[in-house]
Amino acid sequence: MLERYGIVTRETVLAEGVPGGFSSLYGELSNLEMLGTARRGYFVEGLGGAQFALGGAVERLRELRPRDGEEAEPLVLSAADPAQPYGASLPWPKRAGARAARVAGAHVVLLGGEAALFVERGGRSLVPLREPEEAWMRQALAALVTHVRSAGVKRLAVERFDSEPVADTEIMPLLIEAGFVPGPRRAVLRP
């Protein structure tokens, strides 16, 4: 589990459905700490108090942490990726009407380490996980476009934003600005 997640917490173990829960692994994780294979500490704010991590994971987190005055780079991850903590170690952000899940084919755009935009499987719907604001939406869409183009996706056709037809929403001009081509019922991005 340490190899898969890098950091293991009570919530991670519960999400994995390990028989006996966290207490069944705690002794082994403590042994790995004594052997120098794992570290125990409080590495990620908001996760449980007892956190065990591989040394490389801790160093990677430190590298990714923005310095004073710097803004964190946006990150697009598969919603089901073990490195994506929402829906496993962390609850999805609560926002009226927002629905997100750890399903194959869906993606999450993280801004500053926080889930901002959920891309449903197939890309037909974009679900904001925080109140929509132009500044962060522009940043999230730019990251999504970069991800789609670098991943070799044939096309991304967005039909809905926040449960509304995309053509009727305030995000359409931002999609066009990001490189999408408007259509009668959707905005399409081709690599």
Predicted regions and their residues:
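Long, charged, low-complexity, helical-prone intrinsically disordered regions
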Residues: M1-P191
